UniProtKB/Swiss-Prot annotation:
Cited HAMAP family: Adenylate_kinase_Adk
Keyword Heme: no
Span list, region LID: 154-191
Species per Swiss-Prot/TrEMBL record: Oryza sativa subsp. japonica (Rice)
EC number: 2.7.4.3
Annotated function: Catalyzes the reversible transfer of the terminal phosphate group between ATP and AMP. Plays an important role in cellular energy homeostasis and in adenine nucleotide metabolism.
Signal peptide: none
Region (NMP): 58-87
Gene that produces this protein: ADK-A
CDD domains, sorted: ADK
EC class of the enzyme, as a word: transferase
Similarity comment text for this entry: Belongs to the adenylate kinase family.
UniProt protein name: Adenylate kinase 3
Length: 241
């Protein structure tokens, strides 16, 4: 239910009004982000969201929200999950359709984590066509696997604080120890070379047909994701301008 405006603090209300005024002149955009783990999507996504006044739609988050809100689609999704089944493509597309109706999605969206297959891409296109819209751009965060391995397998975490380090790019003062507490650092299970290799193999097999599908439509922008974040941001802005 919408909040009573009288109960919203003035500063929050003013900030939101200014945001909407700034966004009113922005062109609508519907963008898909594609890229392997560690490619930098997470760094660029909030910048794209703020710059172009888009909402960020991550399929995992949307599914959890729909289940928690007990929407009709969320109830169906929970039934599938409780049985240990995958949530059907039609259900996921329906949940995306629901999410797109939010006020924050008026100027368009960034879709992250979907589509993962050509069939999903086709179903998404069909749903958007019914609304008279389409995907405007697919940002492909292209990066060599060897660079990803260096990025990811060098990551170390201080468990209790969440502080992160990298053996090459942001090393601790003393190898293997947290700068503040001197406690040992750990590596996430997913950040090992063996786990990364299998994740990347699965990603390439699954994603290449999707990129080919959108390339035929002429809407893929291949980004040099190995570059420093600020340079990637410049490429993103050029691709979306």
């Amino acid at each position: 239910m919408a909040a009573n405006l009288e109960d919203v603090p003035s500063m929050e209300l003013m900030t939101e009004l200014l945001r909407r005024m700034k966004c009113s002149s922005k062109p609508d955009k519907r963008v898909i982000l594609v890229g392997p783990p560690g490619c930098g999507k997470g760094t660029q996504s909030p910048l794209i969201k703020d710059e172009f006044c888009l909402c960020h739609l991550a399929t995992g988050d949307m599914l959890r929200a729909a289940v928690a809100a007990k929407t009709p689609l969320g109830i169906k999704a929970k039934e599938a999950m409780d049985k240990g089944e995958l949530v059907s493509d039609d259900l996921v597309v329906g949940i995306i359709d629901e999410a797109m109706k939010k006020t924050s999605c008026q100027k368009g969206f960034i879709l992250d984590g979907f589509p993962r297959t050509v069939v999903q891409a086709q179903k998404l296109d069909e749903m958007l066509a019914k609304q008279g819209t389409k995907i405007d751009k697919v940002l492909n965060f292209a990066i060599d696997d060897a660079i990803l391995e260096e990025r990811i397998t060098g990551r170390w975490i201080h468990p209790s604080s969440g502080r992160s380090y990298h053996t090459k790019f942001a090393p601790p003062k003393t190898p293997g120890l947290d700068d503040v507490t001197g406690e040992p650092l750990i590596q996430r299970k997913d950040d090992t070379a063996a786990v990364l290799k299998s994740r990347l193999e699965a990603f390439h097999v699954q994603t290449k047909p999707v990129i080919d599908y959108y390339t035929k439509k002429g809407i893929v922008a291949n980004l040099h994701a190995e570059k420093p974040p600020k340079e990637v941001t410049v490429e993103v802005q050029k691709a979306l301008s």
